[in-house]
């Protein structure tokens, strides 16, 4: 299943794609709760969906039983304006030189230990928003990445258990001001200024749950410029 954030009448909302249609899961919860005289959780953002995923599946099942063939018609979001599937409080942890081919492009080998850096969540824009270059930019490069969405809190997780913490996947574009990055690297400085400016992280358009991608190591990611 796919999880998406969208804007409706100026309000940020969240939904899931079911049978090819985006449905407003918060509205589903509200209406079904009213019909059954039960209290179901509210869903305001993607974190609510991730943390209460078992309710999402139950609500869809109950909705199909109650509304039958009218379910999708009643709850479908028409012409949605998709926004980045993230909340501003999210943590974005990135890996440098994580693709062997990309490492070769830089003239180096893939590192034995992960090279970790971070990006601020307020750098994120939706997948089809315009990327505005900062005034100081001389060379801006796109870097398309597979983004792994962590679904629950963990610490000191063993490698064998790591996938238990994954909720799903989306696509990220790690926009980088390359000349600034190289200049900072020569000084031994971190990759911070070159990767943390407004609009430096297009993300989305949605999150695909991990059950739909049994082998995330066998995916093709493609990016085109202009």
Where are these regions (language model features)?
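N-terminal non-catalytic cap/leader segment that marks the start of a structured domain
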Residues: 1-114, 212-214, 222
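Glycine-enriched loop-and-adjacent helix/strand subsegments that border the catalytic/binding cleft
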Residues: 89-226
């Amino acid at each position: 299943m796919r999880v998406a954030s969208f804007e409706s009448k100026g309000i940020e909302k969240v939904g899931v794609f079911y049978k090819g249609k985006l449905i407003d899961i918060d509205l589903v919860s509200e209406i079904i709760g009213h019909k059954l005289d039960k209290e179901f959780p509210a869903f305001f953002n993607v974190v609510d969906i991730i943390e209460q995923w078992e309710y999402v599946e139950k609500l869809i099942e109950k909705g199909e039983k109650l509304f039958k063939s009218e379910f999708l018609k009643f709850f479908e979001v028409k012409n949605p304006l998709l926004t980045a599937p993230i909340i501003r409080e999210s943590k974005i942890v990135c890996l440098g030189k994580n693709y062997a081919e990309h490492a070769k492009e830089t003239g180096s080998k893939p590192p034995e230990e992960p090279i970790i850096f971070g990006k601020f969540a307020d750098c994120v824009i939706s997948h089809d928003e315009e990327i505005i270059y900062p005034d100081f930019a001389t060379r801006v490069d796109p870097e398309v990445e597979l983004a792994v969405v962590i679904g629950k809190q963990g610490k000191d997780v063993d490698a064998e258990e790591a996938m238990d913490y994954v909720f799903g996947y989306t696509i990220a574009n790690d926009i980088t001001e390359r000349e600034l990055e190289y200049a900072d690297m020569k000084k031994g400085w971190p990759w911070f200024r070159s990767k943390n400016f407004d609009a430096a992280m297009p993300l989305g358009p949605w999150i695909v749950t991990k059950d739909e991608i049994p082998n995330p190591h066998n995916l093709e990611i493609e990016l085109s410029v202009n």
